[in-house]
Every structure is written in structure tokens, then in C-alpha cells.
Amino acid sequence: MIEVDRIVSANAKVDDEYIDRAIRPKLLSDYIGQPQVREQMEIFIQAAKLRQDALDHLLIFGPPGLGKTTLANIVANEMGVNIRTTSGPVLEKAGDLAAMLTNLEPHDVLFIDEIHRLSPAIEEVLYPAMEDYQLDIMIGEGPAARSIKLDLPPFTLIGATTRAGSLTSPLRDRFGIVQRLEFYSVEDLASIVTRSAVCLQLEIDVEAGQEIACRSRGTPRIANRLLRRVRDYADVKNGGKITALIAQEALKMLDVDLAGFDFMDRKLLQAIIERFDGGPVGLDNLAAAIGEERDTIEDVLEPYLIQQGFLQRTPRGRIATSRTYRHFGLEQIEK
């Protein structure tokens, strides 16, 4: 799938992880953006610490790349506890989860990424653990099998997902705190770029940070990835100093335009305008026109274009909006 190689992909890449850990904020005071989430979490964490309780179980959802893992680690740091990290697909057996739960210290955080991908068997183990801090374990097999209950220390489960609607109701209802992360403003992304540059000991102009931020599709992960590639360009072309001009040249080389579109985004929108008179066009015809799979268009290309108002899905097919025509400097066809 093309998403693997796109520099504007919000999904994590292997080379993102090491750098992201180095520049990730550790405390809420360093956390940029999401003001409502930050304000609420400050209150919830302070209240839990005053009562000397574990924080309520927390569900964090939103599009990829917005900082769900970062927020989970911040919660653990603010609470002064350890965090154990795993993901839904990794937990294949009930024993895997039981081993993690029984090794938790009081008030520790268990972070499960992609929690919507937990198997039903794992969810069944989680229910009493979340609600009563108890673990039901089956000992033996066949007629001799019996269930025993183990008491667990109070802990906080933090679940992260890009698909909150895929969670079962019983699991979703057991989270006392639910936070949705929204796309970031250009101003907040510029602040994130500046902070990341300081962490990486880079010399960057304010205007250069803005150039990167406005192309980052509202997503810190993309902003930090673009910053690293612009740094490479600046190291070669300008002795490491990132000016607005250097940032513009680097981003042009990377083929990322002012809207954060890459070649594939533009190919899709231009096909609708040039080959189908702006639409409506069916998904199969569009896939054939640009040489991509239906799933790639629906799951990878379209979400950002729709969210930003460049594309509409209608019962008759896909339509390019007036904003798309303006972006390409074209006059919209009257129908």
C-alpha cells in the first residue's frame, strides 16, 4: 500500500519512533495544543493524587499521529508511576494479559495501543480487572477445571484507538475518562516544530517553522517528520540553518505543497477535475483512472481530503469542491 512510503502519512514509521521518543514532552506543562484535554487531565490527575487513588481508566481516541501515546506517557509521568506498554494485536492469549496485570504496582499505568483490536477472550479478562481490580483465572482442564480470583492492585488502563466506534459497548463503558484528540492548528504545529528543533539542537527561523507547520496536515507526527527531512536539506545546502527559503526549497523537493498534498493527493483530485469534469465519479472508475486500489482511495487518500473540504462523497460518487478548483487555480465548471 502506498501509505507506507508517503512522507505525509500519519501512520508511524520505524524511523519515527527513535526521534519521537527523544522529542516527546514528558509533562502536561510541555504539552502543546489540545487545550481542553490538557485542562481536564490536569484536574483529573491532581484530584487522583490528592486522594492517593489510581487515575480512572482513560480512553484516548482520534486520527493517527496526534499524540495518543505521548499523552499516555505524560499521564504516567504526572502520576509518578510506571507505565507498561502493549498493543491489541500483541495480546493473543489471556495469559499474556494476566502476566502484565499481575506485575503491576499500585497505581501503575497499563497502556494498550490499538485497543479496538483486542480479541473477545482478552476483553473478558479485562472486564473484572477494570471494574473490580480482580483477575479470574481458570486452573486445570476439563471437568477438573476451576476458577480462582486474584486481587490486583489499583491500576489505570489507558486505551488508545483510531476507531472508537469499533470498541464493544461493555469495554467502552468501563472507561471513566474519554478524551478525543483533534487535528492541530497551524499555530500549535509551528510551536511543536520550534520545540522539536530545540530538542534536536537545530537552528530554525520562525517563518521556517510556519512553512513546515502549514504543510503538516494538522498532525504533529508529520510535522516532526518534515522537520527532519528539511534538516537534511539544510545540512547540505545551508550549513544546517533552516530559513524560510530553505524550508520552501526542501518541501518543494519533497513534493509537498501548501495544503500538505503530495503527488497522490493531487493525482486523485486532478483526475476528478480533468477526466470526470469535477464529478460525480464512482469509486471503481476513479480507481481505474489513477491506477490505485479502491481500499487505498477510501482508507488512505480520501479521509484528509474530505476532512479539509476538498472532496465530497455523495450517493452518485465523488465530487471535487470549489476549494479544490481554487487550490489548483482553476475555474469551476458550471453545471
From Swiss-Prot:
Residues 185-255 are annotated as: Small ATPAse domain (RuvB-S). Residues 4-184 are annotated as: Large ATPase domain (RuvB-L). Keywords: ATP-binding, Cytoplasm, DNA damage, DNA recombination, DNA repair, DNA-binding, Hydrolase, Nucleotide-binding. It is found in: Cytoplasm. Residues 258-335 are annotated as: Head domain (RuvB-H). It catalyses: ATP + H2O = ADP + phosphate + H(+). The RuvA-RuvB-RuvC complex processes Holliday junction (HJ) DNA during genetic recombination and DNA repair, while the RuvA-RuvB complex plays an important role in the rescue of blocked DNA replication forks via replication fork reversal (RFR). RuvA specifically binds to HJ cruciform DNA, conferring on it an open structure. The RuvB hexamer acts as an ATP-dependent pump, pulling dsDNA into and through the RuvAB complex. RuvB forms 2 homohexamers on either side of HJ DNA bound by 1 or 2 RuvA tetramers; 4 subunits per hexamer contact DNA at a time. Has 3 domains, the large (RuvB-L) and small ATPase (RuvB-S) domains and the C-terminal head (RuvB-H) domain. The head domain binds DNA, while the ATPase domains jointly bind ATP, ADP or are empty depending on the state of the subunit in the translocation cycle. During a single DNA translocation step the structure of each domain remains the same, but their relative positions change. This is Holliday junction branch migration complex subunit RuvB. It comes from Histophilus somni (strain 2336). The lineage of its organism: Bacteria, Pseudomonadati, Pseudomonadota, Gammaproteobacteria, Pasteurellales. The gene is ruvB.
